[in-house]
Regions:
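Conserved catalytic core of the tyrosine transesterase superfamily
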Residues: 1, 107-113, 146-158
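Acetyl-CoA-dependent GNAT
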Residues: 2-7, 11-86, 90-99, 103, ...
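A generic structural signal for short beta-strands and their flanking turns/coil linkers
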Residues: 70-75, 106, 126, 146
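Short amphipathic helical patch at the helix-1/turn junction of helix-turn-helix
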Residues: 79, 113-114
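Short glycine/proline-centered loop/turn elements that form peptide/ligand docking sites
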Residues: 93, 116-119, 136-141
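Alpha-helical structural signal in soluble globular domains
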Residues: 99, 122-126, 152
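Conserved catalytic-core motifs of GNAT/GCN5-like acyltransferases
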Residues: 109-111, 124, 129-149
Length: 158
């Protein structure tokens, strides 16, 4: 599935095995405690909704979504540092929301570092709300950092 954006030179498509080196490189450049190449490979093998944003013929961002039992979980979303603040993270998030709705998902969850104020602002803009806190969830230079748990309801309860 490809999604084209008329206002920017980018497409979103399903992640392929050949994309893993570029995805891993973006992850390493973006996080102090990155996912390994093997974790991304395992996400593909497990059949998670894994997608890449292509700009100028190169992977410029990626997102991974797990869907099961009427729920979805955003596992990872990241944009290459030089392409941030251009709306690509929002486009990846919109694609995940579209795919979740297409799978009849009721609720979509994610965890985010409270220190990641840019991501928190985007999630709130898209209708996510904080519902819980996971203590010491993330590795951090100063030990551990909590995670804010967010949810967005996609289908009203009947």
């Amino acid at each position: 599935m490809n999604v084209r954006f008329a206002d920017a030179p980018a497409t979103i498509r399903d992640m392929q095995h050949e994309d893993l080196a570029a995805v891993s490189d973006i992850e390493r450049r973006s996080y102090e405690f990155p996912w390994s190449h093997g974790v991304f490979r395992d996400c593909l093998l497990a059949g998670y909704q894994s997608m890449v944003l292509i700009r100028e013929g190169r992977v410029a961002g990626y997102a991974i979504l797990s869907v099961a039992a009427g729920e979805a979980h955003i596992l990872n979303v990241c944009v290459q540092p030089e392409f941030r603040s251009m709306g690509y993270g929002e486009r990846l998030l919109d694609e995940m929301l579209f795919r979740a709705r297409s799978a009849s998902v009721r609720d979509i969850f994610l965890e985010v570092r409270p220190s990641n104020t840019t991501a928190l602002a985007l999630y709130r803009k898209k209708g996510f709300r904080v519902v819980a806190n996971r203590p010491a969830y993330y590795q951090a230079n100063a030990g551990r950092e909590d995670a804010a748990v967010l949810v967005k309801k996609l289908v009203a309860d009947s």
